[in-house]
């Protein structure tokens, strides 16, 4: 029997950890060098609740230069991973300011998983010192949960691509969200533009 196919699109600020999360999940390796993404696609197989699912992972550019290009990724999306970085309170602020309006415009009714990336940096001394200089601190778990409720996300998870903590759980939750949608409505995902 062929695997069920689901399309996952990941969005969030530039350098918030989107590509690392996808590569660690799909290839089990952590990229040490940061190269800004324009568009990348990965395929990964996952088994959830006894179902084989083939996930098409669509990586997107967070940089503003690509705001007009990014919507090309959205048609037929089954689930959105909306990311921020735990070491960047500004990236969390952009969730309701930028990412939620964009996603809800192009993908109404598509479930959103809010993901706090770079969890390993929450207690990192250097990170805390740098943020303190700007009178900031790492994002707290409850701030992430509150934001997930505020944007009506399907769920909220935190992970670290570097240590791999929580990575699999993110994609399991995303797959479940994508599968649930199929049961609830016949027309799937984002409409064509």
Swiss-Prot record:
Modified residues (ADP-ribosylasparagine): 41
One MF term in the entry's GO annotations: GTPase activity
GO BP annotations listed: actin filament organization; apical junction assembly; cell migration; mitotic cytokinesis; regulation of actin cytoskeleton organization; signal transduction; skeletal muscle satellite cell migration; small GTPase-mediated signal transduction
Cleaved propeptide residues: 191-193
Residue numbers carrying Cysteine methyl ester: 190
Signal peptide positions on this chain: none
Binding site for GTP: 12-19, 59-63, 117-120
SUPFAM superfamilies in the record: P-loop containing nucleoside triphosphate hydrolases
Places the protein is found: Cell membrane; Cleavage furrow
Membrane topology label: Lipid-anchor
Sequence motif Effector region, residues: 34-42
SMART domains in alphabetical order: RAB, RAS, RHO
InterPro entries: P-loop_NTPase (IPR027417), Small_GTP-bd (IPR005225), Small_GTPase (IPR001806), Small_GTPase_Rho (IPR003578)
GO cellular component term of the entry, any: cleavage furrow
This protein's UniProt keywords: ADP-ribosylation, Cell membrane, GTP-binding, Lipoprotein, Membrane, Methylation, Nucleotide-binding, Prenylation
Keyword match Ribosomal protein: no
Lipidation (S-geranylgeranyl cysteine): 190
Family: Belongs to the small GTPase superfamily. Rho family.
Role according to the record: Regulates a signal transduction pathway linking plasma membrane receptors to the assembly of focal adhesions and actin stress fibers. Serves as a microtubule-dependent signal that is required for the myosin contractile ring formation during cell cycle cytokinesis. Regulates apical junction formation in bronchial epithelial cells.
Stated name of the protein: Rho-related GTP-binding protein RhoC
Organism: Gallus gallus
Gene name in the database record: RHOC
């Amino acid at each position: 029997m062929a695997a069920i196919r689901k399309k996952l699109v990941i969005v969030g600020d530039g350098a918030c950890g989107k590509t690392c999360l996808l590569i660690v999940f799909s290839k089990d390796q952590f990229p040490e060098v940061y190269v800004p993404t324009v568009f990348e696609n990965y395929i990964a197989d996952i088994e959830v609740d006894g179902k084989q699912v083939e996930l098409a992972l669509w990586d997107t550019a967070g940089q503003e230069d690509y705001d007009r290009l990014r919507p090309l990724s959205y048609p037929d999306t089954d689930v959105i991973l909306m990311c921020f970085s735990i070491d960047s309170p500004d990236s969390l602020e952009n969730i309701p300011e930028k990412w939620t309006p964009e996603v809800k415009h192009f993908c109404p009714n598509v479930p959103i998983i809010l993901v706090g990336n770079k969890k390993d940096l929450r207690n990192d001394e250097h990170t805390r010192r740098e943020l303190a200089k700007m009178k900031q601190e790492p994002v707290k778990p409850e701030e992430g949960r509150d934001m997930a409720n505020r944007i009506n996300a399907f769920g909220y998870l935190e992970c670290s691509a570097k240590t791999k903590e929580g990575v699999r759980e993110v994609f399991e939750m995303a797959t479940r969200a994508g599968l649930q949608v199929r049961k609830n409505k016949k027309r799937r995902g984002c409409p064509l533009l």
